[in-house]
Amino acid sequence: MRKLARESAFQLIYEYQFLKELNEDTKQALILRNKLDEDDVRYLDEVCAGVVRHYDELNQKLEGALDRQRPERIYRCDRSILLVALCEMLYMPEIPPKVSVNEAIELSKIYSTEKSGGFINGILSNFLPGGSDHGEDH
């Protein structure tokens, strides 16, 4: 199920922010626990590889979309959710951008603070077609 694969990707990227590498043991445990099928594992590999490959660029785009908040003040949980969603939006055209935004908000309801959903929605809306594209210039 894509929802569980996306949640697994979020968890791997959260861990990546600390370790600076994708942990294969964690990945295998998530695949088994969430009973991910072949398509889900393919998605998981694609999104995690995309975030790692474009990590600095994605972070710059996120920081460019901030209004007044200092980048280092973003909760790592929120940043992980944002990285997964933004990778989908920019590098995985088969996923509708609004789906990425909605799923990111849903993840924030489970893993982050009460206000995170609105924050995440505000940041990602900059990258929707017709959004302000703050991140594109930075």
Where are these regions (language model features)?
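N-terminal interaction/assembly modules
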Residues: 1-117, 121-138
